[in-house]
Amino acid sequence: MSDNKPSEGDNKLQLKAPRRIVLKKTVEGSSIKQNFAHGRSKSVAVEVRRKKTFLKPGSKEGGFLIDQEKPEEIEEKKEAPKSPKRGEERHILRPLTPEEIEAKQKELEAKRQAEEEAARQKAEQEAARQKQEAEAARRKAEQEAARQKQEAEAARRKAEEEAARAAAAAPAAPVAAPAEAAPAVPVAVAEPVVVAQPAPEAPAPVVEEEMVEAKPLPAAAPAAPSAPVRLLHQPVEEEPKRKLSKAQREEMARRKTEDLVSKRLNQLEELREQKRKEDARKEAEVALAKKEKPVVAATAAAAAEVVAGRTPREDSAGEPFSAGRRKNKKYQDNEDRLQQPRGKSRRRKPFKSEMQAPAPVYREVTIPETITVGELANRMAVKSSEVIKLLFAQGMLVTINQTLDQDTAVLVVEEMGHKPKSVSESAAIEAELDAGEDAAEDMETRPPVITVMGHVDHGKTSLLDAIRSTDVTSREHGGITQHIGAYQVTLASGDKITFLDTPGHSAFTAMRARGAQVTDIVVLVVAADDGVMPQTVEAINHAKSAKVPIVVAVNKIDKPGSNPDRVMQQLSDHGLVPEAWGGDTIFVHVSAKSGEGISTLEEMLLLQAEMLNLQSNPTKKRARGTIIEANLDRGRGAVATCLVQNGTLRVGDICVVGNEWCRVRALNDDRGNQVSEASPSMPVEIIGLSGVPQAGDDLVAVNDERRAREIAQFRQQKDKEAIQAKQQPATRLEDMFEHIEQGEVEELNVVLKADVQGSVEAVAEALRKIKHEQIEVRVIHTGVGGINESDVMLAVASGAITVGFNVRADAKARDLAKREQIDLRFYNVIYDLVDDISLALEGRLAPTVREKVLGHAQVREVFRITKIGNVCGCLVTDGIIQRNGKLRILRQNVVVYEGPVSALKRFKDDVKEVREGFECGISIEKFNDVKVDDVLECYVEEQVKQTLS
């Protein structure tokens, strides 16, 4: 038999176990904590089944040794959930219900709010306590400083008195040895003034993260802390020993960090405030010490020892030096030096430079009469886009080259913040051309200028013919005056009178107004048979606006049916009361045909002129006059009729005439005779103009031809800019929307040429007055003289008609117009011109559609016919029903359908119409919902030609 002792490598079960058997619980009950992503957690009961194990003393349990000194680690390791081993039962964890989740969230939120409120209240209490302590320390320091100040003042006075007594009692010492006499003089030195500083709180243990400014100020004397030591890091209460989720741990850490940061910031702010107060107190004490330095009258020895109120052993603040004092001062100096930056800049105060935006520059912007958008922007030193944006915001669409008037430019400059300065170069030129006042000794009597005004066909020109013994009326087209005529008449007495004959037609309003402005007396001609007419009233208004006296000539008194008294009554209603009725208006009854009353009229005119005392300076004044009429003559060029008003106009003079200039080549009087000079109130015809001036322009003589050219060119440029601004105004958004809603208005373009400038103005104004809501006349070009090839080319490009008034077209213009099929119209009377243009406009108007009701029929019966529909059996109640008409179905006076008649029959025959009282059958196209007692209204649509009136 073998030995019963087993070998070391034998693994067979023996009766005696090598280790002792320990019976432990095979089933252990515990709980684990289940955490969810949303922050909730739940405890779950877990049972762990174990097998029997053999344990030796001191062996490890569960893979780790039990350490009694580290319960936290054991707790954490025990609480860590273990993954189930293979073969063990897996437990499924039940998730929380929505109600439980909501309740848990409310609980956590309430807890967080309670913690925040408690922390806030605690911080407020701490801040209030610190504030009270700081205030108490400040008051105590102020009281102590006041007490020490009083003691120092008393000691200083005492020292001064003792020094004065000692100086008076001691013998005078030699000046050469002041040092030997110094010890013999007992000098009382004032005790050092010790300023009590408020005892700061005990320095808290400063952590490494704190800033330099947070270190406490050094105490004046070592003293026990007056308050218990406060730690920056307060001990945090231990959390209950339970497993927290990751979100909860992060939230708690965040709150702790925020509390710590806010607490440190509060402490730092308190320390800074204390340091600021301490610095301010020290500065105040130093300033007070400098102000109160005593001036002691002592001997030379005392003066050597006492300098500026302190001993040589005192510092600048008046305090004695000591070892502790030197140490503290050195510590403070080093501390201040550390706070200063390194390098050379340590000697200077830190300076922080900041970039500052440049201040806006406001300018005085000079604005002429017209200016472009780009030029205005350059003068304001801004971008053109800014000006365009500003005008766009105001509703104006402009471009960089758009011309603005002065008022608009002023508004833009003010809106941009600049100061506008409006200048007028035209005003400067006018001031240059103005010669000033005339001396009284140079004035001489001049002939009166009399304008004859009145209604058309009342005999104005015939009256002038009777006075001049001429026959102008027979040479006028249509028997009416269409130009201003200027004549000078020499009476039998030798006196001279200048007459201006103005047109009476309504189209010549501008001519009449121009004649009233240059006249001295107005002769108002009224026909005794017609009485006061519209142009008569207009002439009265022109004369009143010009403040010119009126002499009424009642013409045609020899004509049957004349009633001068009615004329006087009508004129009285307009403010012209006759002298016979107690007024101040002169009435003269004349007859241009028989010559009756002509001499009386001349006498009244001379009397009125004498009362006006008309004078001028003919010798010592530059010539000045007004252009009455201007035209373009084929052989002589531009010709103008001028009425000289002051000075004397001579041949060879250089003149500025409106936008033109001239060197006078010839002067012709009213009868066509050449003269060498023209005196005041004399009408003459001037030859030698650079162009055709406008009627009403001023003529001024100048000394220099170059200056005359410059003025003329400047005026032409200004007129060109004004025309461009008028022709191309800034487009407004409101106007654009209005055109979009209403549609474009059709235009009739006209190129107008006339013999004289006054006729051009009159005809153009008459054409512009022809208006209609759908069409209007647009005069695109005007000129004086015959129609040439360029006028026809302009008409071709713009699709215009060419109108000539008292002029004709040359051969080239006629050939071009024939090839291009351009309509050329020629007129001598303004009536015919206006009538033809009106007819042309009416021809372009679209006809209007007018509805005409023919009759009514009542539905008596409705028949249903296959493949046709409903047929109405009707009775015509009034009018007729036509086959080609339209029907309107009325049901209780309400229109239910409109449409054409499909079929109209009487019995079985188709008929064209059915009259009143007869029955018929009517079929309506595309409508079958006809009921008994409906009324059928028959109507037709017809086109009617529109008229301008």
From Swiss-Prot:
Stretches for region G3:
501-504
Matches recorded under Pfam families: EF-G_D2, GTP_EFTU, IF-2, IF2_assoc, IF2_N
Where is this gene product found? Cytoplasm
Alphabetical list of Gene3D superfamilies matching this protein: P-loop containing nucleotide triphosphate hydrolases, Translation factors, Translation initiation factor IF- 2, domain 3
Q: Where is this region: G5?
A: 591-593
- Keywords, A to Z? Cytoplasm, GTP-binding, Initiation factor, Nucleotide-binding, Protein biosynthesis
TM region positions: none
Annotated spans, Disordered: 54-183, 217-288, 305-357
Show the coiled coil region(s). Answer: none
Binding residue positions for GTP:
454-461, 501-505, 555-558
Please name the PANTHER family in this protein's record.
TR-TYPE G DOMAIN-CONTAINING PROTEIN (PTHR43381:SF5), TRANSLATION INITIATION FACTOR IF-2-RELATED (PTHR43381)
Its protein name is Translation initiation factor IF-2
Organism for this UniProt entry: Magnetococcus marinus (strain ATCC BAA-1437 / JCM 17883 / MC-1)
Give the lineage. Answer: Bacteria, Pseudomonadati, Pseudomonadota, Alphaproteobacteria, Magnetococcales
